Amino acid sequence: MANKNEPKITVAAENRKARFNYAIEDTIEAGIALTGTEVKSVRGGKSTIAESYADSRDGEIWLINANIPEYLQANRFNHEPKRPRKLLLHRKQINKLMGAVEREGMTLIPLKLYFNERGRAKLLLAVAKGKKLHDKRESEKKRDWGREKGRLLRARG
């Protein structure tokens, strides 16, 4: 049974390949500025953030290439599916993220798009560095060995 004290978070979109393709250094929660039809479309669960990334423009952080499809019940006031969306962060957080991206060769990758307990759309943003092919193979071997180890322990015990 679910605990009543746990916050109710509804995940709308998840970037599953991010943890495989990138070495994640740090995560930060950011708000996202959406229009009304975008919010309804995200609540419907049709949005994808798999090929998206965040970038800085004019001292702000923007989510680029996230696909939030048009809301079918909306009429002529619908939104553009792949438009850049502003991320809502404090100035200190923006400066920290921009510094990490410029100096250390990191990139900003969205991990999860969700609604928090107050119903606000949030984005879990990761400061990450791209993995090389041999790093991806190594993490895949570790994952396979963990699965195999679990199977062996279950078979014995």
From Swiss-Prot:
Region Disordered, residue ranges: 133-157
Single GO MF annotation: RNA binding
Record key words, sorted: Cytoplasm, RNA-binding
UniProt xrefs under InterPro entries: SmpB, SsrA-bd_prot, SsrA-bd_prot_CS
Recorded coiled-coil stretches: none
Record's compositionally biased regions (Basic and acidic residues): 135-151
Record Gene3D superfamilies: 2.40.280.10
A GO BP annotation: trans-translation
GO cellular component, one term: cytosol
Subcellular location: Cytoplasm
Pfam families attached to this UniProt entry: SmpB
Similarity remark: Belongs to the SmpB family.
Function per UniProt: Required for rescue of stalled ribosomes mediated by trans-translation. Binds to transfer-messenger RNA (tmRNA), required for stable association of tmRNA with ribosomes. tmRNA and SmpB together mimic tRNA shape, replacing the anticodon stem-loop with SmpB. tmRNA is encoded by the ssrA gene; the 2 termini fold to resemble tRNA(Ala) and it encodes a 'tag peptide', a short internal open reading frame. During trans-translation Ala-aminoacylated tmRNA acts like a tRNA, entering the A-site of stalled ribosomes, displacing the stalled mRNA.
This protein's name: SsrA-binding protein
Provenance organism: Bradyrhizobium sp. (strain ORS 278)
Gene responsible for this protein: smpB
